[in-house]
Swiss-Prot record:
Alphabetical GO biological process terms: tRNA threonylcarbamoyladenosine modification
Family assignment from sequence similarity: Belongs to the KAE1 / TsaD family.
SUPFAM superfamilies on file: Actin-like ATPase domain
Keywords, comma-separated and alphabetical: Acyltransferase, Cytoplasm, Iron, Metal-binding, Transferase, tRNA processing
Keyword Lipid metabolism: no
Name of the featured protein: tRNA N6-adenosine threonylcarbamoyltransferase
Native organism taxonomy: Bacteria, Bacillati, Bacillota, Clostridia, Eubacteriales
InterPro entries according to UniProt: ATPase_NBD (IPR043129), Gcp-like_dom (IPR000905), KAE1/TsaD (IPR017861), Peptidase_M22_CS (IPR017860), TsaD (IPR022450)
EC number assigned by the record: 2.3.1.234
Chain positions recorded as substrate binding sites: V138, V139, S140, G141, G142, D171, G184, D188, N279
C-alpha cells in the first residue's frame, strides 16, 4: 500500500492568511483562514502595507491551528508548500519566509506553488474523481483566464484578460456606486434586486476574429460614464439596475468565451475557479449553458473559491510526485505567470 503524502501548505498572497494540511492532494485535514476583509473594508480596498503587517501577526497562530486541527505532529509532514506568486510582494514574503523556516528546521522539502494553479486545483479537492484533461475558467480579483488543463501541472492558456481582471472590475464599479469593498459579493447581492436588461453596457470588441481574450476596462468606463451622465442630468440612479446590468455583461462575456473554448477543445467538463466562481449569477448562467451543450460544470465549495491554503496543498501534491521542489532561495514573484 502506498504511503499517504501529507503536506502543510501556506497561503498569504493577498489579504487572507491561511494554512492547511492536505493528504494526497484531495483530502483536507485542516484549512484555517484568517481574513482581513473587515480591516481593508474601511480603506475601500486592500492596502498592501497593512496586509503584510496583519500576515506577520497571524501566521504563527494560523499554522499552529492547522497542525492542531489535523491532529498531527510537524515531524509527520512530508513537505512544506507555499504560494510564491502572483500576489502582493510584501504579503507573499511573509508566507514564504515562514515556510522556508519550517522547511529548514524540519528538514522537509519546500514546494513553491503558483497561486493560479492553486485555484485550479481546488476542484481536485471538491471533485475527487476529476482528472485532466478538462477546461477551467479561472476568474478572480487579479486573474481572468480560460485554461485547458492538459495534465497535472500542464496548462494551455486559451483566453485571458488584456487589462482588468473581472474581479478588479467588480471592485471598481462597486466603489463607483458606493458599495465599497469587497465589490464582488456586494454587487452580486444588490443585483438580485435589479433588472439586468435595464442598461445595455457594451462588450469589448477585438480586431482579431477568433480570439477568446477578455477586456473589462471599457465596460468599467461605460458604467462610470453612465453614472456621470445621470448625475449631470440630475436623474436618479437605480444602483440595483446598474449592478445587475454590469454583472450580466461580465458574466455573459465569461460564459460565451468559455463555451466557445469548450467546443474548440471538445471537452465535456468545465471547472470554474477563483473568487468570482462564488458569484451566484456566474454559477447559474454557466450551469444553464452547460446543460444546453451537454457539458458538466464543476465548482469548488464557496470556501475553496476564495484564497485558502488547502488549494495550495492540492497543487503541491502533484509537484511532489514529480519531485518538483524549490530550494531556500525561492523568492516572491508578484507577477508570476501560469506555466504553459
Amino acid at each position: 500500500m502506498e504511503k499517504d503524502i501529507k503536506i502543510l501548505a501556506i497561503e498569504s498572497s493577498c489579504d487572507e492568511t491561511s494554512a492547511a494540511v492536505v493528504i494526497n492532494g484531495r483530502e483536507v485535514l485542516s484549512n484555517v483562514i484568517s481574513s482581513q476583509i473587515d480591516i481593508h473594508e474601511k480603506f475601500g480596498g486592500v492596502v498592501p502595507e497593512v496586509a503584510s503587517r496583519k500576515h506577520i501577526e497571524a501566521i504563527s497562530l494560523v499554522v499552529q491551528e492547522a497542525i492542531k486541527e489535523a491532529n498531527m505532529d510537524y515531524e509527520e509532514l512530508d513537505a512544506i508548500a507555499v504560494t510564491y506568486g502572483p500576489g502582493l510582494v510584501g504579503a507573499l514574503l511573509v508566507g514564504l519566509q515562514y515556510a522556508k523556516g519550517l522547511s529548514y528546521a524540519l528538514n522537509k522539502p519546500l514546494i513553491g506553488v503558483n497561486h493560479i494553479e492553486g485555484h485550479i486545483s481546488a476542484n481536485y479537492i471538491q471533485h475527487k474523481d476529476l482528472e485532466p484533461p478538462f477546461l477551467c475558467l479561472v476568474v478572480s480579483g487579479g486573474n481572468t483566464f480560460i485554461v485547458y488543463v492538459e495534465n497535472y501541472g500542464e496548462y494551455e492558456i486559451i483566453g485571458e484578460t488584456r487589462d482588468d481582471a473581472a474581479g478588479e472590475a467588480y471592485d471598481k464599479v462597486a466603489r463607483a456606486i458606493g458599495l465599497g469593498y469587497p465589490g464582488g459579493p456586494k454587487i452580486d447581492k444588490l443585483a438580485k434586486e435589479g433588472n439586468e436588461n435595464a442598461i445595455k453596457f457594451p462588450r469589448a470588441k477585438f480586431h482579431e476574429e477568433n480570439t477568446l481574450d477578455f477586456s473589462f476596462s471599457g465596460l468599467k468606463s461605460s458604467v462610470l460614464n453612465y453614472l456621470n451622465t445621470m448625475e449631470m442630468k440630475k436623474e436618479e440612479i437605480n444602483r440595483a439596475d446598474v449592478a445587475a446590468s454590469f454583472q450580466k455583461a461580465v458574466v455573459d462575456f465569461l460564459v460565451d468565451n468559455t463555451m466557445k473554448a469548450a467546443k474548440i477543445k471538445k471537452v465535456d467538463e468545465i471547472a470554474v475557479a477563483g473568487g468570482v466562481a462564488a458569484n451566484s449569477c456566474l454559477r447559474d448562467t454557466i450551469v444553464k449553458e452547460g446543460e444546453k451543450n451537454n457539458i458538466k460544470i464543476l465548482f469548488p465549495s464557496i470556501k475553496l473559491c476564495t484564497d485558502n491554503a488547502a488549494m495550495i496543498g492540492s497543487a503541491a501534491y502533484f509537484q511532489f510526485l514529480k519531485s518538483d521542489f524549490s530550494d531556500l532561495n525561492l523568492n516572491a514573484v508578484p507577477n508570476l505567470k501560469l506555466n504553459k
